[in-house]
């Protein structure tokens, strides 16, 4: 009997912990559309390496990359993606408007701004961040997600890291 009550209590604690994480997640706002335009599986073994910023130590390495997803996202003025991460690296291309990017690890909450025609690489692999449309027109971006688990999520909601005041 005591074992059964202990198991039940443990289950309640686990459920509360799981739901607590969901309650702390920060979903997006002002997302006009988020359309997956393609999803594919590599037919050969792919060992993906991306070097960012010219620093030889700043390399994103994805051995045995899994699925790849392409998505178009449109965010209204004042909208944002919510704090989130990705399982693998993401190449982002801005086609209209301005994207302001905030890194969850940056204690000073310094914005990085990208405009139409700009591209950047998000390292993924659990890196927490938020993208905001702080402009006056719709933000349109195209994203290519690498190393997505087959049939799995390519965007993972995360809780606000607390480094930004918005």
Task: Name these PLM-found stretches.
Residues 2-4, 8-9, 16-67, 112-113, ...:
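A short, N-terminal "cap"/entry segment at the start of jelly-roll beta-barrel domains
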Residues 150, 154-158:
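Active-site or metal-binding loop neighborhoods of secreted/extracellular toxin and effector enzymes
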Residues 56, 62-87:
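Short, surface-exposed binding/anchoring microloops in extracellular/periplasmic proteins
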Residues 81-86, 103, 111-112, 132-133:
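Short histidine-centered beta-strand/loop micro-motifs
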Residues 70-72, 91, 111, 119-121, ...:
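Conserved hydrophobic/aromatic beta-strand scaffold that supports enzyme active sites
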Residues 75, 104-126:
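Short acidic-glycine-tyrosine-enriched beta hairpin
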Residues 86-107, 116-118:
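Glycine- and acidic-residue-biased ligand/ion/polar-headgroup-sensing regions
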